Regions:
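Active-site SXXK
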Residues: 85-111, 338
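Extracytoplasmic
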Residues: 56-58, 74, 80-82, 86-90, ...
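Active-site-adjacent helix/loop patches that line small-molecule binding or acyl-intermediate pockets
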Residues: 34-43, 122-252, 256
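Structured C-terminal helix/loop/strand segments within mature extracytoplasmic catalytic/sensor domains
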Residues: 30-48, 228-379
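A short, well-structured edge-of-sheet supersecondary motif
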Residues: 41-81, 338-340
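Short glycine/serine- and small hydrophobic-enriched flexible loop segments
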Residues: 97-105, 135, 139, 245-252, ...
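Short, well-structured active-site flanking segments
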Residues: 101-128
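Bacterial Sec-dependent N-terminal signal peptides
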Residues: 1-35
């Protein structure tokens, strides 16, 4: 038993050593211009905490830049669309896009048309919903848009956009999250109304990917600890590269115009971009409680004060110990699109709200974002 444990410990050490060595070799050879590898070579402890256990943290990264020929160049690290990770609230970006596309099918409806949803007396608008989604990552407006669209429409749209491996199964943090029946919505236009009746959606096939069974336990809906792996086969999924490609359609529109199949007007894209750059204060939240950098993890995950000359348009998500972000970072010298995902769950128990977000994930994202800006601008 002692010999076996020594072997396991040595194997883990060697695996970690070989991984770090591979980064150094790649950064010094054919991949020497890859800003991701250069950033991951950093001696900063915020970076090293993740790199020293990269498999455990399931780190994936994509960085896209505009080169001197005005073409998009993609740099990738550790991507594998067949390995499941939980995308959390980053799924709200495509859902927001699809909601805008759907209202375009109805000329009388726009983002400011008030609407009500079944069993709710309040009025809402698509504009306010998307602002709340992008800035505060609130689940209620996402769930309303989910009711507006339905699973079948969402998954059809994902395929239409070339997001072939992406699947959306459920609402977020609500009872009956996987209910295949959507609620009725009513839009109010002057003296008339447009009703969207309940839709009855076909059940989506479970995911067939690697790493769908995770951890050593999870907290169930009753609050009990179940001592077995958590099954993610019917959880929302968007491969990081598919999410990133959607971001490129928004932020590198000129360069990606041949691939662009977004059915949005320039005004709608401008609205969406602005929404992804708003501060909590700009949509009515107290700036002392919610600082301007509240929804930014890349660059700002460990600081609150904005840095002059940097604008970030982004969508973050974190749940079950997974943290992800897709962002467009604009400085006076560069334009960078970054998408990144990682996991921090030391005890391997899911749904217990004991994750190392503040200690490990957020500082890593902040430092990585700053490193990338520094590396890109030094070239």
């Amino acid at each position: 038993m002692i010999i076996y444990q020594i072997f396991i410990n040595n194997f883990k050490w060697m695996k970690k050593y070989m991984f770090i060595l591979s980064i150094i070799i790649l950064a010094s050879c054919g991949e020497k211009n890859n800003p991701i590898l250069i950033a991951l070579e950093s001696k900063n402890t915020k970076i090293k905490k993740i790199i020293n256990n990269v498999d455990e943290h399931e780190l994936q990264i994509i960085v896209s830049l505009i080169n001197k020929n005005k073409k998009v160049v993609d740099y990738k690290f550790n991507l594998n669309a067949d390995n499941y990770y939980y995308p959390a609230s980053t799924v709200k970006l495509p859902i927001s896009v699809f909601a805008l596309e759907k209202i375009n099918e109805y000329p009388l409806i726009n983002i400011d048309t008030p609407y009500k949803i079944e069993n709710d007396t309040a009025f809402y608008t698509i504009r306010k919903d998307i602002n709340e989604i992008m800035v505060m990552s609130n689940n209620e407006p996402y769930n309303r848009l989910f009711e507006f669209l339905g699973q079948n429409y969402i998954n059809y749209k994902l395929k239409e956009k070339g997001m072939a491996k992406s699947k959306i199964y459920h609402r977020l943090e609500t009872k009956n999250a996987k209910n295949l029946e959507t609620k009725e919505l009513t839009f109010f236009i002057n003296d008339s109304v447009i009703k969207f009746n309940k839709s009855y959606n076909k059940k989506t096939e479970p995911l067939k990917l690697n790493l769908l069974k995770k951890g050593v336990g999870y907290i169930n809906e009753k609050g009990d600890l179940v001592r077995e792996s958590m099954d993610f086969s019917e959880k929302n999924y968007i491969p990081l590269e598919e999410l990133h490609n959607l971001s490129k359609l928004l932020f590198f529109r000129e360069q990606e115009r041949k691939k662009n199949n977004l059915m949005l007007s320039e005004n709608q894209i401008s609205f969406l971009m602005k929404s992804m750059n708003l501060s909590p204060n700009e949509i009515g939240y107290n700036s002392e409680e919610y600082p301007d950098t509240f929804s930014n993890l890349l660059v700002y995950g460990d600081i609150q004060k904005p840095i002059n000359g940097i604008k970030i348009y982004n969508k973050i998500g974190f749940a079950y110990g997974y943290v992800s972000e897709t962002a467009f970072i604009e400085t006076t010298k560069s334009s960078i699109t970054i998408s990144i995902a990682l996991k921090v769950n030391n005890n391997q128990i899911f749904n217990d709200n004991e994750y190392e977000y503040e200690e490990i994930a957020f500082p890593f994202l902040a430092e990585f974002g700053r490193e990338i800006i520094k590396i890109v601008e030094s070239n």
